[in-house]
């Protein structure tokens, strides 16, 4: 299959997407590292990042914000990628499921309850206090989903997750940067978190690293991959999901994971995908928001946001399922225009 704005890695083979054989699963939660100033733009302020996953879940589940008056935005007023993802879900009719990955505030929409607590700041404390419980939640959801869908697209909403991914990768000897929701990556802040984390406790095994330095998403994904054997897992996200794929390979011994992301992430951190051996197992959505009517969406082209809430994976899903670029862009623009009224 040749689609000019979707690049499918040569190690993936044929992909068949339809709303009958695919489900989108959003794992959403918080990590206290997002409260550090300058770490993430996934919220108008560090404190607001506590509620970003909550409102992202509400946008995916209900099509509107219920816990706040406005959607999560960067400090510059650029909207959450949940806007893009929900618009594509509406356009394609794809089913979705929201998972509690450690909400600070539970959303006002239906979700798969895990009773997982928010992840902690690894520079101050063990990041995942009940790792086995988180992993078991992943295993249980995997057993429910496996075999019922040909494709399971997994998205995330974890503000600060590229920082925890950076720390875990560094602990495993991978000296490469992770992406960011900001045009200029806060590399020095990420390095500071890593140094503080390693001073607190120094571990080297992949599972210990994810527990000490990571977040619930990483542990949950390891558990999920343990149970999902018949369905194809498509990790919809950027360097957070690249890190998850690496952990799954090291802990579960599986190297069949597909990572689907945007060209904004891939062009920013292609070295990490190469180092992790993911270039041939990646789907890259070459998205261009330059024609959008809304300025906040056009600014995605300037390196803001880049990825999140499965945006890149859902774009590639829609294109492979037969929707045109113009249909997708119009749906996104129309949804956001209506959303702002």
Curated annotation (Swiss-Prot):
The record's SUPFAM superfamilies line, in alphabetical order, gives: Nicotinate mononucleotide:5,6-dimethylbenzimidazole phosphoribosyltransferase (CobT)
Entries under InterPro entries matching the protein: Nict_dMeBzImd_PRibTrfase, Nict_dMeBzImd_PRibTrfase_arc, Nict_dMeBzImd_PRibTrfase_sf
Q: Which Gene3D superfamilies match?
A: 3.40.50.10210
- Superkingdom of origin organism: Archaea
GO terms (molecular function) for this protein are: nicotinate-nucleotide-dimethylbenzimidazole phosphoribosyltransferase activity
What does the similarity note say?
Belongs to the UPF0284 family.
Full protein name: UPF0284 protein Ta0078
Q: Which species?
A: Thermoplasma acidophilum (strain ATCC 25905 / DSM 1728 / JCM 9062 / NBRC 15155 / AMRC-C165)
């Amino acid at each position: 299959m040749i689609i000019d704005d979707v690049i499918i890695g040569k190690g993936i083979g044929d992909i068949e997407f339809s709303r009958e054989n695919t489900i989108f699963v959003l794992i959403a939660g918080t990590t206290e590292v997002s409260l550090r100033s300058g770490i993430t733009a996934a919220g108008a302020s560090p404190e607001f990042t506590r509620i970003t996953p909550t409102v992202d879940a509400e946008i995916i589940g209900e099509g509107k914000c219920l816990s706040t008056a406005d959607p999560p935005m960067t400090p510059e007023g650029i909207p959450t990628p949940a806007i893009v993802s929900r618009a594509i879900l509406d356009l394609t009719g794809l089913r979705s499921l929201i998972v509690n990955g450690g909400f600070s505030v539970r959303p006002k929409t239906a979700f798969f309850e895990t009773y997982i607590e928010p992840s902690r700041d690894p520079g101050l404390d063990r990041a995942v206090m009940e790792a086995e419980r988180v992993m078991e939640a992943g295993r249980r959801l995997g057993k429910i989903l496996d075999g019922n869908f040909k494709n399971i697209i997994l998205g995330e909403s974890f503000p600060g997750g590229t920082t925890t991914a950076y720390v875990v990768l560094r602990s495993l000897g991978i000296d490469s940067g992770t992406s960011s929701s900001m045009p200029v990556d806060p590399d020095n802040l990420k390095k500071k978190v890593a140094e503080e984390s390693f001073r607190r406790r120094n571990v080297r095994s992949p599972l210990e690293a994810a527990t000490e330095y990571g977040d619930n998403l990483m542990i949950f994904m390891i558990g999920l991959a343990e149970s999902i054997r018949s369905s194809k897992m498509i990790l919809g996200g950027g360097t957070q999901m690249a890190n998850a794929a690496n952990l799954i390979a090291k802990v579960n011994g599986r190297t069949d994971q597909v990572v689907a992301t945007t060209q904004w992430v891939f062009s920013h951190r292609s070295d990490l995908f190469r180092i992790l051996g993911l270039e041939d197992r990646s789907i890259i959505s070459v998205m261009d928001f330059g024609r959008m009517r809304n300025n906040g969406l056009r600014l995605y082209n300037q390196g803001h946001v880049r990825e999140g809430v499965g945006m890149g994976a859902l774009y590639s899903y829609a294109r492979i399922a037969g929707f045109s670029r113009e249909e997708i862009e119009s749906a996104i623009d129309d949804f956001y225009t209506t959303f702002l009224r």
